[in-house]
């Protein structure tokens, strides 16, 4: 069973609200909008110390009752973390080791193997779900290359392999959906996203091709990636299509 906290992802895809500002206020709003999960983006929130991060996660979980994905995205993968890589990894590792810490952690496939393994080992030891992610903001890799990326994520220890790409054509989008479907039919949990205008519809379509997570914004003016709908919009469209 694939789950994050007590949320069973085998039943249906979860809508993840990306928290990138005013953490407690926006988290409450996301919960009211119907979010299933919260992604706490430490890099976008500007949180760099363990105490503040731990308190933020504790309050958000207590106030909303929703499971939390912890992300501290590197600049090379589209994030805003500007500190040392060792500090980024240490912060992730320490937070996922806390009893009342996050329920899942996102670590990039591109992170150095030693650093990536450190985060994954800590997560597994504390029963936390591991998301191994890969982001390409300039293109969509070829079909077989995308399959290989997901395979490498699972070999690295992913419970969920996440792949976000920038399509240049409708064919790119179709290939991504094919990759998601193949992975799901093979029994693997994936999250696949085509960003930007061409891929915007995948945020509500990909769940029907095997994607177990779809990310959404809480405020329309502020989003973490191009093409994100708002949480309530995604929930409504998914309900109409189910």
Swiss-Prot record:
SUPFAM superfamilies: Aldolase. 3-dehydroquinate binds at residues 39-41, 73, 203, 228. Pathway: Metabolic intermediate biosynthesis; chorismate biosynthesis; chorismate from D-erythrose 4-phosphate and phosphoenolpyruvate: step 3/7. GO terms for biological process: 3,4-dihydroxybenzoate biosynthetic process; amino acid biosynthetic process; aromatic amino acid family biosynthetic process; chorismate biosynthetic process. CDD domains: DHQase_I (cd00502). Involved in the third step of the chorismate pathway, which leads to the biosynthesis of aromatic amino acids. Catalyzes the cis-dehydration of 3-dehydroquinate (DHQ) and introduces the first double bond of the aromatic ring to yield 3-dehydroshikimate. This is 3-dehydroquinate dehydratase. It comes from Methanosarcina barkeri (strain Fusaro / DSM 804).
């Amino acid at each position: 069973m694939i789950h994050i906290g007590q949320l069973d992802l085998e039943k249906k895809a979860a809508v993840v609200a990306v928290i990138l500002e005013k953490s407690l206020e926006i988290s409450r709003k996301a919960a009211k909008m119907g979010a299933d999960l919260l992604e706490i983006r430490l890099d976008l929130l500007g949180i760099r110390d363990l105490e503040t991060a731990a308190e933020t996660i504790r309050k958000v979980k207590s106030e909303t009752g929703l499971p939390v994905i912890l992300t501290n995205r590197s600049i090379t993968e589209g994030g805003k973390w500007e500190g040392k890589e060792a500090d980024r990894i240490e912060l992730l590792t320490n937070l996922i080791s806390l009893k009342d810490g996050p329920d899942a952690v996102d670590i990039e496939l591109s992170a150095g193997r030693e650093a990536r393994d450190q985060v994954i080992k800590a997560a597994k030891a504390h029963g936390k779900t591991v998301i191994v992610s890969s982001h390409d903001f300039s293109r969509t890799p070829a079909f077989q290359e995308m399959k290989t990326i997901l395979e490498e994520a699972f070999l690295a220890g992913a419970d969920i392999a996440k792949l976000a790409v920038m399509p240049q054509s409708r064919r790119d989008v179709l290939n991504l959906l094919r990759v998601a479907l193949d992975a799901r039919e093979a029994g693997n949990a994936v999250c696949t996203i085509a960003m930007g205008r061409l891929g915007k519809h995948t945020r509500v379509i990909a769940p029907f091709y095997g994607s177990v997570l779809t990310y959404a914004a809480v405020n329309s003016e502020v989003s973490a990636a191009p093409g994100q709908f708002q949480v309530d919009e995604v929930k409504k469209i998914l309900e109409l299509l189910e």
